[in-house]
Regions:
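Alpha-helical transmembrane segments of multi-pass integral membrane proteins
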Residues: 91-99, 147-171
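Alpha-helical transmembrane segments of multi-pass membrane proteins
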Residues: 16-39, 167
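Alpha-helical transmembrane segments and their helix-start/interface "positive-inside/aromatic belt" motifs
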Residues: 2-20, 72, 146-154
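Short aromatic-rich membrane-water interface segments that cap or initiate transmembrane helices
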Residues: 45-60, 116-125, 179-191
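Juxtamembrane "helix-exit" motif on the non-cytosolic side of transmembrane helices
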Residues: 29-34, 107-115, 165-176
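Membrane-interface helix-boundary motifs at transmembrane edges
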Residues: 77-89, 140-152
Length: 214
């Protein structure tokens, strides 16, 4: 019983340590920089007095990317790495972390606002780094990817590429279709994220099925 309670206490400590530190951090930032605490805690729609549905497509994309990361990391944690599953297990972990990284970037506009100010580099440099990370992952795990439903992964990449193309030629495309350019740019991006989730889901299921064969 004592051992069980000790494990439970350790779990609760690890569960709440970071959130409590986070709350202290935003309280410190509020006092240090004279920023109202509500800026950190309230919903953006309330702070900006805007429609709660503002940015719904972007918010949905963040949720889906977060779900992608969560299921991949869960499957990685559930799949005990053995000699035969180690490669696939690490692939799931990498896919999960990269998904969460993209979700955080989308949520806080990291590559558009935060990173350029913090590291004094352009947005394009950050996008290039993301691209190199993705290419590096594909090169490292290409054999593993070929064992998965990579067609779904390919479809997701096509939609992401279409979104980038629309973003690269805004004036030309806007001259043809007006404000609907935004729908195509963000719409292709959302469809790419959905494809990314579908691929993450199938890979996670594939990883969990490997447990049954161990």
């Amino acid at each position: 019983m004592f051992s069980s309670n000790q494990k439970l206490s350790s779990f609760l400590l690890s569960l709440y340590s970071l959130p409590i530190l986070f709350l202290f951090a935003i309280a410190f930032a509020s006092l240090k920089f004279d920023i109202p605490i509500t800026t950190f805690t309230r919903d953006p729609a309330v702070i900006g007095n805007i429609n709660p549905l503002a940015g719904i497509a972007s918010h949905l994309g963040v949720l889906v990317l977060t779900a992608s990361g969560a299921i991949c990391i869960f499957s990685w944690a559930a799949l005990q790495p053995t000699r035969s599953t180690k490669k696939f297990s690490l692939f799931l972990l990498g896919l999960g972390i990269f998904s969460l990284l993209l979700g955080l970037d989308d949520l806080f506009m990291l590559h558009e606002s935060i990173y350029p100010r913090l590291f004094r580099v352009s947005e394009n440099v950050i996008l290039l780094i993301y691209g190199l990370l993705a290419i590096g992952g594909i090169v490292k795990y290409w054999r593993t990817i070929l064992q998965t439903d990579y067609f779904i992964f390919g479809v997701a990449l096509i939609f992401f590429a279409l979104s980038l193309i629309v973003d690269a030629f805004p004036e030309l495309i806007e001259a043809m279709i007006g404000q609907w350019r935004i729908l195509f740019e963000d719409g292709f991006k959302l469809l790419g994220i959905i494809g990314w989730f579908g691929y993450s889901w199938r890979c996670s299921i594939q990883g969990l099925k490997k447990i049954q064969t161990l």
